[in-house]
Swiss-Prot record:
Keywords: Cell membrane, Flavoprotein, FMN, Membrane, Oxidoreductase, Pyrimidine biosynthesis. Catalyzes the conversion of dihydroorotate to orotate with quinone as electron acceptor. Binds 1 FMN per subunit. This is Dihydroorotate dehydrogenase (quinone). It comes from Vibrio atlanticus (strain LGP32). Pfam families: DHO_dh (PF01180). Belongs to the dihydroorotate dehydrogenase family. Type 2 subfamily.
């Protein structure tokens, strides 16, 4: 009820202004009596995945807390894990505004943010200040002005800097809002990137005395053959997990709706079915070789269960959280 009232107010604002205001309020009120409005104690539903123990299988997807400013707030809401970022080596402003749009009737969101963030060093300082005791994922990407043929360098820079602070590292090569980025999902480009990341992982494991898993985040807009090739590369390079999926460029489900023609990636309920199909295809190809984190339209216990029945070990929420609020986390966890 409280969230529905708050949402009514927030939805009167421009989508990005509402997002920024929410982040500011979470920063301001976490640790004060006001955070009782969203703090919740949930039953433990531990899941072993990528060599880590997650308190429960429901995580926050990357993109909501790009700079790691509200880790403790999201921890208080009962998430089993929190993924921050996407973060790049250098700060960047992202794409021109407006760049975030609600498709309310479809419970979807279109964004063309463009990896706006304050840079990896800023994120690390925020992580250091956090008291969160759950699994923290850090999602890394490349700067827009880094040539795609040198993209691996950006991932390696970020990986080296975040390694000791991350529970796992998510490698984002699937955002549609950085020109050329999705080309890294294919063929030799993917093999070369994963090989370099795996080599760096071994070096950093020796340096820091701990193993931090790597998970690759992929797009929903892939053919079965492309998914098969990605799976081959994941297994060949001994990557620890795969996150499926990012946002879609497909607009067929939202055709005719307000904002449907805005450029960018579509998330939320409209991508639910396709992302679940990608999870299912990945599971057919991978079996138990590496775990899948399912994301895309997880806006209810039923949607979460569908992802898990398709083969996901964990799930993440973002757009569903915007539309349903923190209660969504509890609804999923309590019903599993």
């Amino acid at each position: 009820m409280l969230y529905r009232l708050a949402r009514t107010g927030f939805f009167q604002l421009d989508a990005e202004k509402a997002h920024d205001l929410a982040i500011q309020n979470f920063k301001r009120f976490t640790g004060t009596p006001i955070d009782l409005l969203y703090r919740q104690q949930l039953p433990n539903r531990p899941v072993e995945c990528m060599g880590l123990t997650f308190k429960n299988p429901v995580g926050l997807a990357a993109g909501l807390d790009k700079n790691g400013e509200c880790i403790d707030a999201f921890g208080a809401m009962g998430f089993g894990f929190v993924e921050v970022g996407t973060v790049t080596p250098r700060p960047q402003a992202g794409n021109d505004k407006p760049r975030l749009f609600r498709l309310v009737e479809a419970e979807g969101i279109i964004n063309r943010m463009g990896f706006n963030n304050l840079g990896v060093d800023n994120l690390i300082e925020n992580v250091k200040k956090s008291n969160y005791d759950g699994i923290l994922g850090i999602n890394i990407g490349k700067n827009k002005d880094t040539p795609i043929e040198k993209g691996a360098e950006d991932y390696l820079i970020c990986m080296e800097k975040v390694y000791q602070y991350a529970g796992y590292i998510a490698v984002n090569i699937s955002s549609p809002n950085t020109p050329g980025l999705r080309s890294l999902q294919y063929g030799e480009a993917l093999d070369d990137l994963l090989s370099e990341l795996k080599t760096k992982q071994s070096e950093l494991e020796e340096k820091h005395g701990k193993y931090v898993p790597l998970a690759l985040k992929i797009a929903p807009d892939l053919s079965d053959d492309e998914i098969s090739q990605i799976c081959e590369s994941l297994i060949k390079n001994k990557i620890d997990g795969v996150i499926a999926t990012n946002t879609t460029l497909d607009r067929s489900i939202v055709e005719g709706m307000k904002h449907c023609d805005e450029a960018g990636g579509l998330s939320g309920r409209p991508v639910q079915s396709r992302s679940t199909e990608v999870v299912r295809k990945l599971h057919e190809e991978l079996g138990d070789a590496l775990p899948i984190i399912g994301v895309g339209g997880v806006d209810s216990y039923v949607a979460a269960k569908e992802k898990m029945m398709a083969g996901a070990k964990l799930v993440q929420v973002y757009s569903g959280f915007i539309y349903k609020g923190p209660g969504l986390v509890g609804d999923i966890v309590k019903n599993l």
